[in-house]
Amino acid sequence: MAHSVKIYDTCIGCTQCVRACPTDVLEMIPWDGCKASQIASAPRTEDCVGCKRCESACPTDFLSVRVYLGSETTRSMGLAY
């Protein structure tokens, strides 16, 4: 099972998700599309354990973790977006 962390353009650059991640999957990168000029990125998705702590920490509720089951259909991990 692979996890893919999706960061949408409503990220406010607060870094709470980065600090909440127990496996250090997330990092902040420069991004002109938000107020803080930085956005969360997930370059190490293979290390994601799907705990969703990043989602819980996100004050804007626009961070989502989705589970991809190989060639099967994508299923949401209880997210609303």
Curated annotation (Swiss-Prot):
Keywords: 4Fe-4S, Chloroplast, Electron transport, Iron, Iron-sulfur, Membrane, Metal-binding, Oxidoreductase, Photosynthesis, Photosystem I, Plastid, Repeat, Thylakoid, Transport. Its cofactor is [4Fe-4S] cluster. InterPro entries: 4Fe4S_Fe-S-bd, 4Fe4S_Fe_S_CS, PSI_iron-sulfur_center, PSI_PsaC. Its main location: plastid. It catalyses: reduced [plastocyanin] + hnu + oxidized [2Fe-2S]-[ferredoxin] = oxidized [plastocyanin] + reduced [2Fe-2S]-[ferredoxin]. Binds 2 [4Fe-4S] clusters. Cluster 2 is most probably the spectroscopically characterized electron acceptor FA and cluster 1 is most probably FB. It is found in: Plastid, Chloroplast thylakoid membrane. GO terms for biological process: photosynthetic electron transport in photosystem I. It holds the Pfam family Fer4_21. It comes from the Eukaryota. Its EC number is 1.97.1.12. HAMAP family: PSI_PsaC. NCBIfam families: PS_I_psaC. This is Photosystem I iron-sulfur center.
